[in-house]
Amino acid sequence: MKAKEINELTTAEMLEKEKQFKEELFNLRFQLATGQLENTARLKEVRKNIARIKTALRQQELNK
């Protein structure tokens, strides 16, 4: 998910996306621990998406 796409979301949508990404990260970590994870790069993608969302939320908070 690109930063531009994230900035177009509402605050509620951002929070929902963050929750979804955190759940996905949790599941990916379990798959990694059990040796079932094939695409390890997905871990990095999800972590970066969470960071992008948190950054956008903070920017909105500071702009108010």
Curated annotation (Swiss-Prot):
Keyword ATP-binding carried by entry: no
Name this protein carries in UniProt: Large ribosomal subunit protein uL29
Record family assignment: Belongs to the universal ribosomal protein uL29 family.
Naturally occurring in which organism (per UniProt): Ligilactobacillus salivarius (strain UCC118)
Transmembrane segments: none
Pfam families per record: Ribosomal_L29
UniProt entry tagged with the keyword Zinc: no
Keywords recorded for this protein, A-Z: Ribonucleoprotein, Ribosomal protein
PANTHER family in alphabetical order: 60S RIBOSOMAL PROTEIN L35/50S RIBOSOMAL PROTEIN L29, LARGE RIBOSOMAL SUBUNIT PROTEIN UL29C
NCBIfam families (alphabetical): L29
Gene3D superfamilies: 1.10.287.310
CDD domains: Ribosomal_L29_HIP
InterPro entries: Ribosomal_protein_uL29, Ribosomal_uL29, Ribosomal_uL29_CS, Ribosomal_uL29_sf
Gene Ontology cellular component annotations, sorted alphabetically: cytosolic large ribosomal subunit
GO MF annotation terms: structural constituent of ribosome
GO BP term, example: translation
